[in-house]
């Protein structure tokens, strides 16, 4: 990847969504707003969620588009939204962090693995949940750009 996939302006805390659908739309709007995807990609994010949950555990969900929506990705990017109150992603699946991902080609796999590394460490998850705001959150997770 030649450019940072995560920039400070794509980190939002707190997010304003109260439902899973609102959170996916909020993440999608950030990706569209930065020029990474077309609006059709956001529709594909919702379509994927209807087929398979993107809940990952550890308060995390990673909504992303379908294979058919690859053509709607302009450049690789991700956004992170943290919510003060948990969003019910599914039965018994509380989410406070939503990471929207768009990856050109196979880049989404390396992006996913970097996010997984961060969220596989319980101490890191607690830091992300406790971060004072978007600047501190960005500092904690900017390693996804490495």
Regions from the PLM with identified roles:
Residues 1-146:
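Cytosolic covalent-transfer regions centered on His/Cys nucleophiles
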């Amino acid at each position: 990847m030649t450019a940072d996939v995560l920039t400070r302006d794509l980190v939002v805390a707190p997010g304003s969504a109260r439902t899973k659908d609102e959170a996916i739309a909020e993440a999608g709007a950030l990706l569209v707003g930065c020029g990474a995807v077309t609006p059709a990609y956001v529709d594909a994010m919702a379509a994927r969620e209807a087929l398979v949950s993107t809940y990952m555990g550890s308060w995390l969900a990673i909504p992303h588009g379908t294979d058919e929506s690859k053509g709607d990705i302009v450049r690789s990017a991700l956004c992170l939204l943290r919510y003060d109150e948990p969003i019910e992603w599914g039965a018994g699946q509380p989410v406070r962090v939503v990471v929207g991902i768009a990856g050109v080609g196979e880049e989404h796999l390396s992006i996913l693995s970097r996010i997984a590394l961060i969220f596989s460490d319980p101490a890191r998850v607690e830091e992300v949940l406790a971060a004072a705001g978007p600047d501190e959150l960005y500092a904690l997770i900017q390693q996804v750009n490495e």
